Amino acid sequence: MNRRIAPPQPFARVDSTETATALARGSAWAFWIWAAVGLMQAGLVWFLGAPEQAEFRGATTGFAVVFSGVAAVLGLVQWRRPNRILPVFGLAWALYELSAMSVSLMVGASPAAPGLPVWSVGVAGAGMVLCLLLHIGGLRGATGMARFTSANRA
């Protein structure tokens, strides 16, 4: 398979600068996936939200759009200048989202806004798991980049 189109494998060996860079940029893809899921949820809240929640629709949608914009910008920053800080932040954010979703499922509450289809929760959960894996790979890649950079300086 052509390495240029191969997806990043978060648990692959980091044995070269190219592999480390590809893994670190995988974290940027995770932020962009996160932004896409956030925009999907914003659209669903706006168009399919429960009528009794209409007064909160604008704020909820705006909040989701702002967070999607933040995630897209973080992805751009991680793509241009891969570092270790953003994958750690992404890991923490993904773990928080997954734990909040898990707790709401355990207590029997709806993990999504009222009136949204059940499949949207599945898409968001799958997206968060994918983001978590890509951020793990991003952290490993950024650490490898730092290691290779310090080895080249010495």
State where each predicted segment sits:
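Topology signature of small-to-medium multi-pass alpha-helical membrane proteins
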Residues: 2-154
